[in-house]
């Protein structure tokens, strides 16, 4: 197993725990992604599985008015582009480069060469106030799932996407307990945050189930996000 991440300390610790290798990679950098794949393949060989999880977000309205001063501002285009570059272009960059590597492998007995799982979000379908960039990036990941699966079908490479709801991630771990509890209570059932092992179980199912291809699946406890 090889882990790509921008957080070197956390990445090295997790790679050690899992018995894998760590490569410091910024998915917006062509050079770093290329170097990451080269280092990973030198250490463990050409991958047959890729799971893309890199992502970031912000909360800025398309245009807004300051309640105190009346000043009007719009979403900074540079901030919008940063979200697109990390979430969408970074996902596609890693997908394309991994698929090209998988194509060099001999097919397995069932004709398969590899499987790719990308990560979108329920915000792809239930975007909230201030999430224009984030929702656009995640909706685009959903939108490109089937075309990429069709691009790669002749090479025996499957592509699927997970749309997680509210998960217990390091980002949420820093929130006050009352906020975390309110988020958990907003989930229809079960009334709790999603757990990383539940994401992993669905990703594993997508990877190991040969007939599963070109699909985007919500994993969200039946939540439908409110406007805010």
Enumerate the predicted regions with their spans.
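Substrate-binding pocket helix/loop in short-chain dehydrogenase/reductase
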Residues: 61-81, 183
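C-terminal substrate-recognition "lid" of short-chain dehydrogenase/reductases
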Residues: 195-219, 224
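The beta1-alpha1 cofactor-binding region of Rossmann-like NAD(H)/NADP(H)-dependent oxidoreductases
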Residues: 8-9, 25-38, 77
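Alpha-helical segment proximal to the catalytic Tyr-Lys
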Residues: 100, 149-151
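Active-site helix of classical SDR
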Residues: 95, 137, 145
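Residue(s) in the substrate-gating loop at a strand-loop-helix junction
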Residues: 121
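Conserved glycine-rich Rossmann-like NAD(P)H-binding loop of the short-chain dehydrogenase/reductase
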Residues: 1-13
